[in-house]
Regions:
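A structural boundary/capping signal
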Residues: 1-95
């Protein structure tokens, strides 16, 4: 399945929460792993545009602002990641 189809499939079932980019990213990475056995990474840092703590997904070495897509917002970026997690590391540390 191509990248856009994976994103569209996820977004068709996902209901995002305002100001919770980490949840959008976590659920997308979880979906990719459980439904398609695709590994992706959660990236946390200060966003370039909004200048807030923010999360994006790194899928095949390409950053994806899944939260902005889910919310219908302009995509943001993280230039200097503070943390990069795979799904297993994130779940082990946070749940």
């Amino acid at each position: 399945m191509d990248r856009q189809k994976l994103i569209d499939e996820f977004l068709s079932k996902f209901k995002p929460k305002k100001d919770q980019s980490w949840k959008s990213c976590y659920f997308f990475v979880h979906h990719l792993k459980k439904e398609h056995n695709i590994d992706a990474h959660l990236v946390e840092g200060i966003s370039r545009i909004a200048k807030v703590d923010y999360w994006i997904v790194k899928l095949n070495d390409i950053d994806e602002d899944i939260h902005a897509k889910a919310m219908g917002l302009t995509p943001d970026f993280i230039d200097k990641p503070e943390l990069i997690w795979n799904l297993e590391e994130f779940e082990k540390d946070n749940f």
